[in-house]
Amino acid sequence: MRATHWVNVVALTLMVGSGLRIFNAYPMFARKGETFCCWPWEGTEVPAWLTFGGWLAGARHWHFAAMWVLAVNGAIYLAFIWLHGEWRDLVPRRGDPRDAWEMVKFYLFVRKRHPHQGKHNALQKSVYFALPWLGVLAVLTGIAIWKPVQLAWLTNLMGGYVWARYWHFWAMLLLVALTVGHIFMVFTVDPYSIPSIITGKYRPELSPEARNARPLVHLLPPRHEPPAEA
């Protein structure tokens, strides 16, 4: 399963860069001569340094190739967590909204101690649970705007070609935001988990809960004071 993380990073990077290059070929959601209600930057291109693929046709080739890699890799990941029962750690539970709020309070220094957590805290669970669904939405909306005539039922289900393209763009933005946020939190809250991505071994005594760690706070391992003399 650890390998799927690295494949996801590469595939998502290729898809985002090539997708933005495709978007720049027509940086609007409305049809020509029409207006669109929900995007204030209509007609504004994405900076070229964020794009990938060189030209429209090249970007499309990269985009479709990376799409299949991401889809197959996602299917492997979902099959793995299902077969090994790890999906139970990700499915939201009744108390998760309350626990997520406690984590927010802790990160904002309103709460002093790190809330107790299992394998993941409630905020992590919400992100990990949302990512596969966003991936599915990105794939379905992408297929809808790729084959709007052959798969008209799917395109219409998304609200038509314009809205399918809009939802596809937002799925990409949210995937990027959650991925960047995840990477930021790993490096600033739980850097000791990074070796486990390769080795699979994790030291609970260095967990964020054990260190009472917030972003960029308490990064060092906890100090164990010697017992006081009698």
Question: Where are the predicted features?
Answer:
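Membrane-embedded alpha-helical bundles that constitute the cytochrome b-like, heme-associated redox core
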Residues: 1-230
